[in-house]
């Protein structure tokens, strides 16, 4: 079984038109090649794309497929400047422990599945800490996989700032799979 080659192409116009820039590895700054990004085609791998250079600003998780305009990746605007390849876990195993309080305290829940609503599924208002035991995951600030996104790989996160969030507003999450 061969591993897919990572490849992402950014276009300055909608529907894959206009100038384009292609990446097959991490790129800390491509905004000098494209002044804006209105569509993306991912032909291999999974990616984190960032609004600002050096992997900063709002991030968006993209898997293989076509994104004909920035609304399709749930972007807030047409600004993207850097990207990273997501190294998916081998074996396809996923396991996440979430905690209602910081430093892994309070009620703990363990899951191996996507969650469109933390409130409905676990009856908690917010996630204050978590442990990614297997796989790579994305947290969303709103239910049903909307709002700001946060990429989490295999490690422990004692507080929301550890996964890049200024607050604990995680209302949904899912596994990142190719």
Curated annotation (Swiss-Prot):
Residues 6-44, 45-87, 94-134, 135-177 form the Beta/gamma crystallin 'Greek key' domain. GO terms for molecular function: structural constituent of eye lens. GO terms for biological process: lens development in camera-type eye; visual perception. The modification N-acetylserine is found at residue 2. Pfam families: Crystall. Residues 88-93 are annotated as: Connecting peptide. InterPro entries: Beta/Gamma-Crystallin, Beta/gamma_crystallin, G_crystallin-like. The keyword Acetylation applies. Residues 2-5 are annotated as: N-terminal arm. Crystallins are the dominant structural components of the vertebrate eye lens. Belongs to the beta/gamma-crystallin family. Has a two-domain beta-structure, folded into four very similar Greek key motifs. PANTHER family: BETA/GAMMA CRYSTALLIN, GAMMA-CRYSTALLIN S. Monomer. This is Gamma-crystallin S. It comes from Macropus fuliginosus. The gene is CRYGS.
């Amino acid at each position: 079984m061969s591993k897919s080659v990572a490849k992402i192409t950014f276009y300055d116009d909608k529907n894959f038109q206009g100038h384009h820039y292609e990446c097959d590895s991490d790129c800390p700054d491509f905004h000098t090649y494209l002044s804006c990004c209105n569509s993306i085609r991912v032909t291999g791998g999974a990616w984190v794309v960032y609004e600002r250079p050096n992997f900063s600003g709002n991030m968006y998780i993209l898997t293989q497929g076509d994104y004909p305009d920035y609304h399709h990746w749930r972007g807030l605007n047409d600004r993207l400047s850097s990207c990273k390849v997501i190294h998916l876990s081998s074996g396809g195993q996923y396991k996440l422990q979430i905690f209602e309080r910081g430093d892994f305290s309070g009620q703990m829940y363990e899951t191996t599945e996507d969650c469109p609503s933390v409130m409905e599924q676990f009856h908690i208002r917010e996630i204050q800490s978590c442990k990614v035991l297997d796989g790579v995951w994305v947290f969303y600030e709103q239910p049903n996989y909307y709002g700001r996104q946060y990429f989490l790989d295999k490690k422990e996160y004692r507080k929301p700032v550890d996964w890049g969030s200024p607050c604990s507003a995680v209302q949904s999450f899912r596994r990142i799979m190719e």
